[in-house]
Amino acid sequence: MINISKKAQEHFTSLLSNEPENTQIRVFIVNPGTPNAECGVAFCPENEIELSDIQLKYDGFFVYVNKDTISYLKNSVIDLVTDKIGSQLTLKAPYAKNNFSKKVSSSLEEKVKCFLNLEINPQLSMHGGRVELIKIDKNGIAAIQFSGGCNGCSMIGSTLKETVEKKLLSSFSEIKKVYDETHHLHGQHSFY
């Protein structure tokens, strides 16, 4: 799925040797399927691995990718390019800006779930978080639930209002209000 050159794999192995035990690599994409899509690579501590992640095995380490964004990383190449100035990792993802959601969803809930997975969760996943739609009632109230780094985060009020609610209300006229059903417990998993 993601082709990592031998030089880049050796570079990752070297970098990981200086990190806490069981730290791996995360490849992520922000704003997938849009002209503003951006890919990135980061360290992935063991406590930031999510149930929604796909694990890819390489020589001496694993790469984790959120399953909802894996199609955007099809045929991606990570390489270590060296020139006179030094070396730099490059990530080329030819499908990052493709819109795979062109199929017509059969329900508002499906459309909202797709929207959350494509527009909101890639941003939240950078902090180890995620949001899921629980239901939309007949009055247009969307019940959502946060998990991972978002659960118990002191910034959740801002994330709910400024990121999730604002984008859902502007994208779906049928939604009148967004309600957070998460039982927030602050802990080591919380981002802030």
Curated annotation (Swiss-Prot):
Binding site for [4Fe-4S] cluster: C150, C153
Cofactor binding annotation: Binds 1 [4Fe-4S] cluster per subunit. The cluster is presumably bound at the interface of two monomers.
GO molecular function: 4 iron, 4 sulfur cluster binding; iron ion binding
Keyword Signal among UniProt keywords: no
Matches recorded under InterPro entries: Fe/S_biogenesis_protein_NfuA, FeS_biogenesis, FSCA_dom_sf, HesB-like_dom_sf, NIF_FeS_clus_asmbl_NifU_C
Needed co-factor(s): [4Fe-4S] cluster
Top-level lineage group: Bacteria
Alphabetical keyword list: 4Fe-4S, Iron, Iron-sulfur, Metal-binding
Gene Ontology biological-process annotations: iron-sulfur cluster assembly; protein maturation
Function, as annotated: Involved in iron-sulfur cluster biogenesis. Binds a 4Fe-4S cluster, can transfer this cluster to apoproteins, and thereby intervenes in the maturation of Fe/S proteins. Could also act as a scaffold/chaperone for damaged Fe/S proteins.
Quaternary structure (record): Homodimer.
Similarity comment: family membership: Belongs to the NfuA family.
Name of protein: Fe/S biogenesis protein NfuA
Organism of origin: Buchnera aphidicola subsp. Acyrthosiphon pisum (strain APS)
Gene designation: nfuA
